[in-house]
């Protein structure tokens, strides 16, 4: 009897592995054909240098309180998109607020990525539309490039209220982003509130994304052009080499230090990686702060090979200890600060639609540097033994992660 059960188990395992391999090969072929066709090729939107007042939020509760407060005060319109939304108390409060503002006569446009928004129930969508909210999914799967279209996600998180206030960063909607999921614990992230000239660029990008994904018309408003104190520039990426060129170009300018903050460290991009290696050869101190504790599968194991390479090059790697670190940023010589939606991984570098804010204002950077320093202090420096002396289970997971690292 046991032999029969064992035989059935081995057969099922063989079938499962076979199906996975077929899907993987099909996905690779589909992605390659799609890339050659240019189906997902778009030039990035590089906006002019602007002057805005910028506030960075690292705590989900504080961000939610401010964002919800700004939405409640909206008089004319709300444009808002997130990569994902949960199905919990926090998300229900958010959706109720959008419906309420629509009923008050405010034009509400809400979008969520099709895969990231998979937990958004049909009844919630229907109630949004019933209450007058304009709703669409971003990047719905399409034929004939089904696998490739599933890969290309809209990872931007743009909010615009009355053309006066904008938001962009790493937070999504759900209680885990407030640190209220016991399994994940404290959630640390970076999200910007923008007041000033830069709001018009966030609104313009939202309108571009909306028109790309929906036939429902969306008006173009006259966002505020009042100048703030901080000099910055937005760039929206649709995937491809431009992001790598931007990062490499900035890293090549480094003279003293580069600090990278990322939840995932899977830098499978030769242009970016070579720029970091060259920086080390010039004597630039390179620090990488990532999150070993994560809400995503296999990303820690996928990072191991790159951590080993980084350590061999003399880079310093730190693992955040206080929960989940989901912020996306880098700081170069305390002269250039990037905060945005781009993770340091292949998905953000090559597949996702992303948006970054590049800040060149020394006064503002001097205020954010201590925030990053605190996160480094709340981290453990990774040594070679940490990534070389792995258990058998971790070694197996690393091998599996290596196969799928491009998509993680």
What name fits each language-model region?
Residues 2-134, 142-156, 160-408:
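Charged, low-complexity intrinsically disordered terminal segments
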Residues 138:
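A short acidic/basic microdomain associated with nuclease active sites
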């Amino acid at each position: 009897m046991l032999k029969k059960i064992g035989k059935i188990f081995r057969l099922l395992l063989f079938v499962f592995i076979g199906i996975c391999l077929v899907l993987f090969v099909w996905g690779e072929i589909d992605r390659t054909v799609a890339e050659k066709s240019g189906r997902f090729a778009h030039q990035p939107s590089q906006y002019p240098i602007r002057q805005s007042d910028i506030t960075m939020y690292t705590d989900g509760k504080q961000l939610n309180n401010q964002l919800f407060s700004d939405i409640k005060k909206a008089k004319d319109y709300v444009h808002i998109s997130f990569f994902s939304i949960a199905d919990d108390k926090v998300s229900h409060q958010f959706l109720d607020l959008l419906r309420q503002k629509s009923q008050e006569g405010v034009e509400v446009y809400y979008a969520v990525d099709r895969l990231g928004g998979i937990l958004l129930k049909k009844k919630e969508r229907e109630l949004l539309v019933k209450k007058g909210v304009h709703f669409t999914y971003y990047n719905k799967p399409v034929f004939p490039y089904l696998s490739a279209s599933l890969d290309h996600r809209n990872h931007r998180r743009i909010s615009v209220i009355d053309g006066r206030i904008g938001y962009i960063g790493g937070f999504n909607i759900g209680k885990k982003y407030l640190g209220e999921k016991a399994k994940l614990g404290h959630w640390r992230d970076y999200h910007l509130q923008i007041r000033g000239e830069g709001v018009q660029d966030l609104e313009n990008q939202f309108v571009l994304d909306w028109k790309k994904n929906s036939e429902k018309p969306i008006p173009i408003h006259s966002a505020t052009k009042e100048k703030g104190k901080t000099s910055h520039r937005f760039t929206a990426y649709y995937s491809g080499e431009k992001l790598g060129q931007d990062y490499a170009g900035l890293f090549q300018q480094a003279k003293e230090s580069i600090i990278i903050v990322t939840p995932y460290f899977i830098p499978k991009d030769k242009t970016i990686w070579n720029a970091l290696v060259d920086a080390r050869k010039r004597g630039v101190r390179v620090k990488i702060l990532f999150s070993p504790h994560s809400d995503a599968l296999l990303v820690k194991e996928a990072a191991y090979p790159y951590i080993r390479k980084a350590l061999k090059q003399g880079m310093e790697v730190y693992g955040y200890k206080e929960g989940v670190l989901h912020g996306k940023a880098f700081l170069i010589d305390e002269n250039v600060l990037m905060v945005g939606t781009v993770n340091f991984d292949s998905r953000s570098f090559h597949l996702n639609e992303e948006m970054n804010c590049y800040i060149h204002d020394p006064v503002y950077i001097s205020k954010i540097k201590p925030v990053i320093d605190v996160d480094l202090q709340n981290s453990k420096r990774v040594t070679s033994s940490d990534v070389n002396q792995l258990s058998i289970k971790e070694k197996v997971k690393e091998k599996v992660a290596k196969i799928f690292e491009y998509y993680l």
